[in-house]
Amino acid sequence: MSARLFIALTIMSAGAQGQTAKQLRTTWGEPDLQGIWNGETLTPLQRPARVANKPVLTPEEAAKVEADVAGRPGRNARAERGTEKDVAGAYNQIYAQRGTRLADRRTSLIIDPPDGKIPPLTPEAQKRKDAVREYMQALLQRTSGGKPGPPSLRHNEPPPFYNVDRLNRADGPEDRSLMERCLAGTLPKLDAHYRMVQSPGQVGITVDWGQGSGFVRTIPVDGSKHLPASIRSYKGDARGHWEGDTLVVDITNFSPKSDYLGSRQNRHVVERFKRVSENRLEYTVTVEDPTTWTRPWTAMEPLEKQSDKENQIYEADCHEGNYGLMDMLANTRAAEKLFKEEKGPNPRTMDIATGGGVDPADQKYSFGRAGAE
């Protein structure tokens, strides 16, 4: 091949790539964010202590993490049959989304603060957390997952705040967790699948996360103002606008019945969606709540485009909540009846919260799930 022909082909190739980038726009001229985007990742939300001084892994370290995860056996076999732990582990890993790659070798999705950690709780938030923990532990007393002693009299008390966790009680649906009630989806939502569609003045996002925890969002991008502060919802009130090629979504008006890492109605979320190439979209989110954290924090998650022909995101159906919750409440009423007739144990001595001893108010995660370390 002559040098002149090689240069001509190189220029044509560069021009074609540039043209492709320009074509990633809708027919009405906005950046095209549409498609199915995969956010599954092995990168945790917070940086684990063992890599506290290493924001980015080496290629060799990242490859080892991916190989170690790939080599872990799935939860396909039951253990300790007949125990509460066995019942709590009724699923194998096919029901749980687990990433297989460290997309950009970072050790945390959080990029600010630089230490990759969620900022400390405010004194007010710590008091809330302690109050909830004490209440939940009191309800576990005398069970396999709690301290010894007689069942606590706090079983007769309402929770200190609107309950979002699994209490060791089933007096009514409000005693069960938001996930059991099919209300688990909240914002921000990381480590998920997204179907994005656009029309003039609106962006729609279908979120698929875990088992029955998805939801649908419709975001106005028309310059409209937020709803009055008196109108609250689980997903908040979202309003979008464009800053160059970045879609910025401002979310306020969260319900006090929603929860994200202890933050409720005072949560303020700002999302940024930017398509950086044909197959990659950067999702950056800043979370602020002066009643929960001492400062705002920001996370960035790379999203990879998936084939529309080979993949589909369906509406999330939470059938467990539709059917299982009623059965759970009915079973508790039956257990109470048997106890009253001296034919069964006191239901308050049965652990229906932790699955056998793990404090649900103190869940921790590391590599393999975008949650708190």
Whereabouts are the PLM-identified features?
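Sec-dependent signal peptide recognition
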Residues: 2-8
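N-terminal signal peptide c-region/cleavage motif recognized by signal peptidases
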Residues: 13-15
